[in-house]
Structures are given as structure tokens and as C-alpha cells.
Amino acid sequence: TTAADAPTGTWTARAILGGTSFAKTLKIETVMPNRLKIDLDLGDGTIVGNVPLAGKLGAQWLSGATAAGLKADIEVRVTPSTTRFSRFTDYVFDDPARQFSGDPQKLFEGALDANGEARINGVLNLPSDAPGMLNASFATRVFEPGGAFSINRNTRAVAPFERFVGLRLPKGDSARDMLMTD
């Protein structure tokens, strides 16, 4: 632990063991707790393809007062996940030949209304070369008048396609770890 009055910033820890030197960068930060309760409602279930998202963002101060007029934004990062369906446990639905890394994208940027709410309407820009199911991580920030912000993170499953094709490989020879063919 660090002392409450310890200086913040980026520090470097160095250790010399034998003739080898090791260095590790450490970030010491002051952590501010959230002062706003944030609720992002995009409905239930899996987000499908490039279907427009419609939802509601709501925020209120932890004291119970509405967060009227505060600025807010939602950033989404999409990452690959393993595709599984409970009825088809023996099948592989992910394409190992496809690589995917998603860039962050803004879903919303604006101000909350007098009730501390905002309507969310947007589309996730999904790549056509996704290897299978994806996870969308929503980072919602609501900014206080002084510039500090509270943050909330949600993760939802995303199906980039309406239909999936799976392969079921034969069991093969487990002793030699290979498929037997005629």
C-alpha cells in the first residue's frame, strides 16, 4: 500500500539480482470513486449484426438528485470470443484463419436531458471478417461540471452474422492424435 500523501505519477522500480538488472514501470494514481450512478439499458439478449441499437442512458447523483444537463459519452470496444451453442457442443463455429482486433468507436456523445437521461441510437460498425461471436465492452462516462467523470462498464455478446456454420470433426485416433481416413 502507499501512503495517502504519496506523490503520484509514473515510477520505475529497478532490481539487480546477480549480474542481471530488472526494471518495471509502476503507475501510482489517485483513485476517485464514482459520484454518479450510471445505467445503460440496451435491452436483453445478444446484439445481432449491424442492427441499429436503441436504448436509454440514465444517470443520477449518488445523493439521489438528477444529473440534468451533464455531458456523457459511450465508447465501445469489440473483441473476439469463442462461439458456442448449447445444442451443438461438438461443433466448431469459429474460423481460425481470421484474425480480428477492433478499434474503439463512439456510440454516443451528448448531454443528458432535464431528467438525467438520453436516448441512444446507433450502429456498431462490425467487420465482415469476424472469426465468430464477439464481445462488446461499453464504457459509459458521465462528466461532472468540474470535469471529473464517473464511469460504468458493461459487456454484451454480439453475433456479427444472422447465421453460423459449424464443423464437427470425427473423433479420430486419440492414441496418435490424428484423423483416420480411407
Which role does the model predict for each range below?
Residues 1-182:
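A structural signal for beta-strand and strand-to-loop patches characteristic of beta-rich domains
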